């Protein structure tokens, strides 16, 4: 699997996607992911939604803030032979970091 938008310093492929998800889940143990739109055909799946959680763990080197924050996300997957072959994902992490007080407003 090819990840076209890996997190900075993340490994490529499935392992990198899993590690990024584990880091995010550790930073937001009560993470709730809401799907707002899902469109699919035989070759592509596109998803948009919102992630919300309370920052109780380290996030990108920053200590926990205890604040709740949310961010919009968009994911697109290319499917080949019934499996995810490619992934593109975009999250409003800057907006989330501002809500947590980790970036200026």
Question: Language-model segments: what does each one mean?
Answer:
Residues 1-105:
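C-terminal and inter-domain tail/linker signature
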């Amino acid at each position: 699997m090819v990840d076209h938008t890996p997190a900075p310093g993340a490994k490529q492929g499935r392992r990198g996607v899993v590690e990024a998800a584990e880091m995010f889940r550790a930073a937001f143990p009560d993470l709730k992911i809401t799907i707002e739109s899902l469109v699919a055909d035989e070759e592509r799946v596109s998803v948009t939604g919102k992630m919300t959680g309370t920052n109780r763990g380290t996030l990108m080197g920053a200590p926990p803030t205890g604040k709740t924050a949310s961010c919009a996300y968009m994911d697109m997957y290319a499917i080949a032979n019934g499996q995810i072959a490619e992934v593109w994902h975009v999250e409003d992490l800057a907006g989330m970091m501002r809500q947590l007080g980790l970036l200026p407003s």
